[in-house]
């Protein structure tokens, strides 16, 4: 974060989000560093508040640990916190998902993002057709979860402000971000509108540059794997002159 501060005038930034991640990776020292180096918004992601489901999907934290991390962030002064949950997780039920949504609402974050399970092609779940026939992964059951989330969140002043879909999503359903008024994630809106340049750093990063006059979008992709990123770094930097030229004209 110090490197970012040296490279960018963060005093001009309207929103500075840090993906704090899962409860088992968050520490007080990390949150203090995030707070003291200019971040204005963080995301803490339980995915579910059901310990049995967390275990089933290989997560190493518990709902209680998430609650502790959330409370810690509040005590440290964070006043714009997003939480993520996923509808359709293996072994989850409508009642379990309902409990997750209700508990998140009670914790009173500024925004809640409701994702629908997307099964990656490399995942074991994708390879097993039988898994998709289990009751908890039927289109109807997941639709019921998503509909409940909409009703409960809007009833508690969380308004939907952005939506997107991914491939292999259960029921071809969507991911929806809900936020309290004035707490919408600007990055999410601008990205969906294809209205924001992205400067990506590190392995698997994707830079996107938008020409304001022509609307042309140019993308540059970093190598995915760290060993490849390191060994082919010079070749990858071949687009740097074009990037610098673009930025100098902004």
Indicate residue ranges for each PLM-predicted region:
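A C-terminal junction/extension of Radical SAM enzymes
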Residues: 122-201
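Short amphipathic alpha-helical surface micro-motifs
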Residues: 1, 69, 96, 169-174, ...
């Amino acid at each position: 974060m110090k490197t970012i501060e040296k490279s960018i005038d963060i005093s001009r930034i309207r929103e500075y989000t840090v993906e704090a991640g899962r409860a088992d990776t968050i520490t007080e020292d990390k949150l203090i560093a995030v707070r003291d180096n200019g971040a204005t918004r963080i995301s803490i992601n339980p995915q579910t508040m059901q310990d049995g489901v967390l275990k089933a999907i290989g997560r190493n934290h518990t709902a209680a640990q998430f609650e502790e991390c959330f409370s810690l962030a509040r005590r440290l002064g964070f006043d714009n916190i997003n939480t993520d949950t996923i509808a359709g997780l293996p072994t989850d039920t409508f009642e379990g998902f309902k409990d997750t949504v209700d508990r998140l609402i009670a914790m009173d974050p500024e925004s809640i993002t409701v994702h629908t399970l997307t099964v990656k092609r490399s995942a074991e779940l994708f390879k097993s057709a039988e898994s998709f026939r289990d009751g908890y992964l039927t289109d109807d059951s997941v639709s019921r979860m998503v509909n409940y989330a909409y009703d409960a969140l809007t009833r508690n002043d969380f308004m939907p402000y952005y939506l997107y879909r991914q491939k292999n999503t259960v029921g071809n359903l969507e991911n929806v971000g809900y936020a309290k008024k004035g707490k919408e994630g600007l990055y999410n809106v601008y990205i969906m509108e294809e209205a924001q340049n992205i400067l990506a750093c590190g392995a698997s990063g994707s830079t996107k540059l938008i020409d304001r006059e022509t609307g042309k979008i140019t993308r540059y992709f970093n190598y995915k794997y760290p060993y490849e990123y390191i060994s082919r770094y010079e070749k990858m930097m071949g687009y740097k002159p074009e990037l610098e030229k673009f930025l100098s004209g902004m």
